[in-house]
């Protein structure tokens, strides 16, 4: 298990290099740079000095090498737009993104999994058909459109919730969480239903029913446990994306999270902030995916046994190799 985690961490290195280089190249191709945005705050001499310091008088490859060298030393750089270290900016915005991600995922799980189970156990019924139509609608609605509709109806129309910011506590969180959670809820409902149907129709559950095991026990104790892996995969994927920053939703609701910080930095050609935010988002997504993979082993005993047998086989092969080398040396 330890070797598996180590390999996954190593796999993150080329991903970070590739993503950061792509960001540098794309922003370099765009007209203007961060110096154009801050020119009014400096004299021409200071701007020339700053241009040399930031490497804008050299190639994008040189600037990228400078950035990666600083990154290796744990420095995400300094934003000349916000006049603060990128790490501080990221940490300042992260709690808002965590609140939004946690609320949307939690509500989605609490609603969609029971709905998916009900749809599967009542396959072909009115409940099943209505839930699938609702899930299809949830998948079809773009986040920006849904967010705007919620603002028009519940904020501007009824005045129940604030339309922007996070100053009103949980009231400010409700509309953004619904916007982010709707797509996840739809996906999770369909996944739960599909996975449960596959398990419910399996032979071993038919055997359990034939032995007189109550249907509730069959569903809760046997079917749900064996249907969890696809469900966990969807939850982990969506959680990772949300932690990376719900860019569209955060901008629609002026939510002060990582996604909005990234968009603001893009508009102002703040390459350092954009790169730092995206690198941290990639790390967050990768960590969540790693946790999902490790969760599989706890949910499914077969995978746990596979990890154990894989480790034993490698140890046995290494021991056999050493024994062979010792035998050759003795000869």
Predicted regions and their residues:
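Hydrophobic alpha-helical transmembrane segments of membrane transport/permease proteins
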Residues: 15-65, 158-175
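Membrane-water interface segments at transmembrane-helix boundaries in multipass membrane proteins
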Residues: 83, 132-194, 312
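Cytoplasmic-entry segments and transmembrane alpha-helices of multi-pass inner-membrane transporters
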Residues: 2-11, 111-150
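Alpha-helical transmembrane segments of integral membrane proteins
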Residues: 2-3, 92-127, 167-319, 324-325, ...
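Membrane-interfacial helix-loop-helix junctions in multi-pass membrane proteins
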Residues: 52-61, 76-86, 168, 180, ...
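Transmembrane helix irregularities
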Residues: 30, 138-141, 243
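An internal, D/E-rich "acidic patch" concept
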Residues: 57-113
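Membrane-topology segments of multi-pass transport proteins
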Residues: 35-81, 308-331
């Amino acid at each position: 298990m330890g070797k598996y985690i180590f390999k996954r961490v190593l796999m993150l290195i080329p991903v970070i290099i590739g993503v950061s280089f792509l960001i540098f190249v794309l922003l370099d191709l765009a007209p203007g740079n961060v110096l154009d945005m801050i020119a009014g705050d400096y004299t021409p001499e200071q701007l020339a000095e700053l241009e040399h310091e930031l490497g804008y008088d050299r190639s994008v490859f040189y600037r990228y090498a400078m950035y990666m060298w600083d990154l290796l030393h744990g420095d995400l750089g300094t934003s000349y737009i916000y006049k603060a270290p990128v790490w501080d900016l990221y940490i300042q915005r992260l709690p808002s993104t965590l609140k939004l991600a946690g609320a949307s995922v939690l509500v989605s799980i609490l609603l969609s999994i029971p709905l998916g189970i009900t749809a599967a156990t009542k396959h072909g019924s009115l409940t099943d058909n209505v839930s699938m139509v609702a899930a299809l609608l949830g998948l079809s609605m773009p986040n920006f459109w849904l967010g705007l509709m919620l603002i028009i109806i519940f904020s501007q129309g009824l005045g129940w919730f604030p339309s922007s910011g996070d100053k009103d506590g949980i009231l400010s969180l409700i509309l953004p969480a619904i916007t982010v959670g709707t797509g996840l809820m739809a996906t999770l409902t369909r996944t739960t239903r599909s996975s449960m149907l596959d398990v419910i129709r399996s032979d071993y559950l038919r055997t359990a029913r034939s032995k007189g095991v109550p249907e509730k026990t069959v569903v809760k104790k046997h079917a749900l446990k064996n249907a969890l892996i696809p469900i966990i995969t969807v939850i982990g994927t969506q959680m990772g994306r949300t932690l990376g920053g719900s860019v569209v939703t955060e901008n629609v609701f002026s939510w002060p999270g990582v996604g909005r910080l990234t968009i603001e930095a893009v508009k102002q050609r703040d390459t350092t902030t954009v790169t730092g935010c995206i690198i941290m988002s990639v790390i967050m997504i990768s960590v969540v995916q790693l946790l999902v993979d490790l969760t599989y082993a706890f949910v499914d005993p077969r995978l746990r046994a596979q990890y154990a047998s894989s480790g034993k086989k490698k140890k046995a092969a290494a021991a056999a190799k050493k024994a062979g080398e010792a035998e050759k040396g003795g000869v």
